[in-house]
Amino acid sequence: MDRRSFLSLAAALPALSAFAQGATTPAFAKLPIGGMDKKLTPAFAAAGYGYLELFITAEIVPGKEDDVFAKNLAALKALPIPTTFLNGFITSDIPMVGPDAQHDKVEKWVRTAFPRAQKLGVGVVTVGSGGSRRCPKGFEPAKAREQFSKILGRIAPIARDHGIRLTIENLNTAETNLCTSIAESVEVITAAGPDVFLTADLYHMMRDNDPAEELRKAKGRLIHCHVAEKELRSAPGTKGDDFRPHLRVLREMGYAGAFSFECGWAKSVSPDKAIAAFRQQLATL
């Protein structure tokens, strides 16, 4: 090896070492970030948020007539950033599990909701709906999981036909009793079929002490993440929570989805400060 080659190799070694240790790639550090508070849309847009994630029940209003949705659609289209994600999914009076599960009503709901979501330009719908999916007392949890998988598998092709990927999210045990961990959520979506995916909610994981390493179980099915700090469900940068244990696992998995801030907003932390704090963590893994 001549001297020039040796010097070139020596100069490259720090970068190669960082890569071997899993240094953050520019692409991962720049993954899209969105907000969930419509009132803050101008601030989101100014701070570089790429999209809004809003609630189906509030914006798509499947239980109301087309003219109501048309007004919402026009207002949403006029906002400075697009609404490309939706969550919430369905009201608690239409149960997806239990002895009174109403799967026909769920399908009727989505046959209104998904075409409307497509008109808005939505690409991902997340099923939270802790009330609708709550396993009733005395009902077998395994049967509830089976029912949940069944209805997800039934409506996922309808979502796909409208250009939408259907996901479920893990919720903590204070909000529901079904799919409260990444592992249980993966079990349900696997049984539901290949058209159902996962939204990993890092806040809910932290509330229930679900380890970051559990995310690896969702490889190939994880397409979206929700983010908030653990104690008060506050925006990143409020208390200073460290999301990097989760972010490292996501990076190592090759995660290429987005991050939605599903959080409250303290006066001390504006959208620009929150996105800067989170981007800093993305860039320093």
Segments from the language model and where they lie:
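Histidine-acidic metal/acid-base catalytic patches
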Residues: 3-32, 38-47, 121, 179-285
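Active-site acidic/histidine proton-transfer and metal-coordination neighborhood
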Residues: 10-23, 95-197
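Active-site-proximal loop/turn and secondary-structure-junction residues that shape catalytic pockets
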Residues: 37, 56-58, 89-92, 131-133, ...
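Short amphipathic alpha-helices and their capping/turn segments at secondary-structure boundaries
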Residues: 41-42, 65-80, 109-121, 153-157, ...
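N-terminal substrate-binding region of glycoside hydrolase catalytic domains
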Residues: 47-66, 87-93
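Glycine-rich, proline-tolerant flexible connector loops at the mouths of alpha/beta enzymes
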Residues: 55-73, 129-136
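Mid-chain, structured segments of secreted extracytoplasmic proteins
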Residues: 72, 78-103
